[in-house]
C-alpha cells in the first residue's frame, strides 16, 4: 500500500461468529473485526468491535464509545459515516442501510429484506455507554450463547417505535442463542471501527 492506509474505517460484519452472543468476549469480537478487515485489504488498521461490557466484581464496565478511537470513520466506499465520537452519538451521524455496509461493501439486509438481519449487537445505551444495574444486556459480556440478552441497534434505522430508529440501542434480543438472535431480526452481526 506504499505507506497509505485503506479508506475503510467502519463496517458491519458480513457474518457473525455463529455462536449467538458468545463472541469470545471483547477480544474475540475484536479479532473477528481484524480478520474480516484483513481479508478485504483493510487490515492495515487496528479494529475494535463496537460493544460495551457490563461491570463485574473484578472489572469496571467497558463503554463501546471508549473503544473505537476518535474518528473520522468512512465506509468501504469512502463515504463519511461520522466525523468524531460526538457526531457518531448524535442525530447527525450518517449510519443508514445505504452506508452501514459490510467490509465487502455489501448491503446488509434490513426491514423488508429476507432475511431481515438489522439487529446489530452493541450492549450499549444510545450514548455508547454500558448499561448499569443487574440485568445482562451483553450475553455475559459476549461469552454466552445461553443466559442473558443483548441490546441491539438497527443499522437501517427502521422498526416499530421511536427507539427502533437507533443505530446502537433499539431493543434487547429475546436471548443469546443464535436462534434467539435470529427470532428478532438478527444474525449476530456487529459494528467494527478502526481506531487509527
Give the label of every model feature segment.
Residues 1-196:
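Secreted/extracellular ectodomain signature
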